[in-house]
Structures are given as C-alpha cells and as structure tokens.
C-alpha cells in the first residue's frame, strides 16, 4: 500500500509482461528509473518499496542509460558508488529542477535519449535549472522568514502571501518554514485570474485539510 506511483507503474508493467510473454529482462531495464522514483517520492522504504529501492540502486550503479550516466558525470557522482543519499540529494533535485523551473520534458527526454549531443545539452540544462532553482528557493525562503519575523511570529498557523514567488519552489519553501518555526505553513501566490493558489506543509499531529 506504500508504493510510489513509479512502483505501481512497474507492477503493472510486470503484470502485462507476464500476460503477454514479454521477457522479465525487458521490464527490469527500467529498475534504475524505478529506484530513482521510489527514493525521490519519499515513500516509506518498507516491504516492496525497500526491495525496489535496493535493486534500483544496483541498477543505477551499472546503468547503461546514456542520460543517467552523463548526468552522474555532470554532477560528479562516481558510477558504481551511488547511494540512496546521492539519489535523494543530487540526482532527484536535478531531475525535478526542469519541471520546477521550466519543463519536465527536459528530464524525461534526457532519460530516454540516445543522442550524445542532445544528452549533453540536456544535462547542462538540468544543472542550470537546478542552480537557478536553488538561488530562487534561497531568496524566497529569506523573504518568508522576514515576513514571519516582522508580522506573524506569534501566529500558530503561518499563511504567507507572496506576489512574485515562483510556484515551482513554494512547496519546498513552505516545508523549510514549517521546519524552522515548527508550525503549519502555507504559501499563496496569485494565479492571474483573481484567485490565489496555495501550497502547504504541516507539522505532526495537525491535519492541514481539517483546518
């Protein structure tokens, strides 16, 4: 019941392969991506998730997937020695950065690509997106901290209205604000349609949907 979306997709692929007689080896070629998705989705690493993560890490360390190999080279990871921490804190943020800052298709294309030049361009783009993401995230976090200190320090529930926040990083920043002040935190931004769009993170024992 704890499977990440990628785990569900993998189980479906296994079932379809069994039904159609497709060799297991074909489905198992995706284990590197399954490992990245399982670890990156921060699901509990128990039961089947633990198995998928374990074999996913093994697959990553021997992967022939050109985009993944070049990404690991680009971020100075040694193929053969990649750990779950490397996946969580280096590989996943770079893959997510394209979706946060521009277009998730950049990362998807990289993982499917076989053209050396296009793959190199994709890696450079992901690294640039992640650098930009970290800068914007850091700046936004400092703005939020200032708002809390100036206006909302005594509030039990932090709701921060930011006009110019990049919505690709508001969830991360809300999480950091929650951790910093140990209070539920919501960041809202205008949608351009006379509405506000919000993302929130809560502390243990407080269901944000019930408030």
Where are these regions (language model features)?
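Hydrophobic, small-residue-rich alpha-helical packing segments that form membrane-like cores
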Residues: 1-8, 18, 25-26
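Short amphipathic alpha-helical face segments that pack within enzyme cores
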Residues: 4-11, 172, 176
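Alpha-helical scaffold elements that line and support the substrate/ligand-binding pocket
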Residues: 12-16
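Hydrophobic helix-and-loop "lid/oligomerization" segment in the mid-to-C-terminal part
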Residues: 17-211
């Amino acid at each position: 019941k704890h499977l990440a979306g990628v785990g569900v997709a993998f189980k479906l692929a296994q079932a379809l392969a069994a039904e159609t007689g497709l060799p297991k080896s074909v489905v198992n070629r995706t284990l590197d991506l399954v490992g990245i998705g399982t670890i990156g989705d921060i699901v509990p690493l128990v039961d089947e998730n633990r198995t998928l993560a374990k074999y996913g890490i093994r697959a990553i360390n021997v992967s022939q997937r050109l985009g993944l190999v070049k990404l690991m080279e680009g971020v100075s990871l040694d193929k053969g020695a990649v750990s779950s921490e490397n996946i969580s804190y280096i590989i996943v943020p770079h893959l997510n950065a394209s979706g946060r800052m521009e277009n998730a298709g950049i990362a998807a294309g990289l993982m499917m690509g076989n053209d050396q030049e296009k793959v190199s361009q994709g890696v450079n783009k992901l690294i640039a997106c992640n650098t930009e993401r970290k800068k914007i995230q850091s700046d936004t976090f400092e703005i939020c901290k200032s708002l809390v200190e100036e206006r909302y320090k005594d509030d039990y529930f932090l709701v921060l209205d930011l006009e110019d926040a990049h919505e690709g990083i508001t969830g991360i920043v809300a999480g950091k604000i929650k951790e910093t002040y140990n209070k539920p935190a919501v960041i809202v931004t205008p949608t351009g349609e006379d509405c506000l769009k919000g993302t929130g993170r809560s502390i243990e024992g407080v269901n944000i949907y019930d408030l």
